[in-house]
UniProtKB/Swiss-Prot annotation:
It is found in: Nucleus. Involved in pre-mRNA splicing. GO terms for biological process: mRNA processing; RNA splicing. Associated with the spliceosome. GO terms for cellular component: spliceosomal complex. This is Pre-mRNA-splicing factor SNT309.
Length: 156
């Protein structure tokens, strides 16, 4: 049985259980009509054997018994990261917090200014529309009333 998680999967799987599962899969696949398969299924099934030959992930890449020089570089980097997190972050976190809050307030102020400007434009447009309608009604009282009557008759 091939395993994908060698440190987690139990290598001592009962062979009878594995055979039973394979038998169930074959039984289900045999019950399906073969004309229902996609034309690429046989090619993919044939390629499955090639996957086992490729070997999967190269575990040697993660082996720590490698080049001593490289291990020293990695150790130095990890030590630097640990010191940075332990020593410097605790001293600078308050300043980082203040700077972040200032940026957030600045962005919020810019957004609010844009919203206020748009609201002012909408209010001015509404006032203009109201003034135009009032002026038109004063200069054309018969037309406006007739239009309103037609609309009322249409919807009532």
């Amino acid at each position: 049985m091939e395993t994908y998680l060698p440190f987690v999967d139990d290598a001592a799987v009962d062979q009878a259980f594995e055979a039973w599962v394979d038998e169930l899969v074959e039984e289900e696949c045999g019950a399906m009509p073969s004309e229902g398969y996609h034309p690429e299924v046989p090619r993919v099934m044939a390629a499955k054997g090639r996957d086992a030959e490729s070997g999967g992930i190269d575990l040697a890449r993660y082996n720590d018994a490698g080049d001593v020089r490289l291990l020293k570089i990695v150790d130095s980097y990890l030590r630097h990261a640990e010191i940075t997190l332990r020593e410097l972050i605790s001293k600078t976190i308050v300043n980082q917090w203040v700077i972040s809050n200032d940026c957030q307030q600045s962005a919020s102020g810019v957004m609010q200014a844009g919203i206020d400007k748009l609201q002012g434009q909408l209010d001015a447009l509404e006032k203009y529309r109201r003034d135009v309608q009032v002026r038109y009604r004063r200069t054309h009282p018969d037309t406006v009333d007739a239009s309103c009557m037609r609309l009322r008759d249409m919807y009532i």
